């Protein structure tokens, strides 16, 4: 997924730059949400496999073979020290390891494509900074967001969809 966006973004940035606009090529590192936990757990499964254990990739994990060398690297780095630890003990370290390993792959892909980023921005750096809360406060004060429930997805049956209240942006009123 990141490659397609990088190619499109780089082409667009090049066109804008050629047209005289000042352009900053920024890569947004999606390292702050639950998907990083899923990635770390998936690497942990591959790590267990590296020790000959049989594992099952349940729904919500990533079974991709691209995780095998990452797990082997983890095995070389920490040995068997995670095998008998609880998830609470290994997950925080493995989250960081997973993000670093994926960013190494992404940077390698970008280099192969000849795409140079000016900056890399970590989503995680926003947490605890107060910036998210401040932005939501400004949007709320200006009447641009509200609490509501989305309609069910159209065009396909979803057995797992449940209505839930969430913060929504008033996009229909603002273009």
Task: Give each language-model segment a name.
Residues 1-175:
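NTP-dependent nucleotidyl-transfer catalytic core
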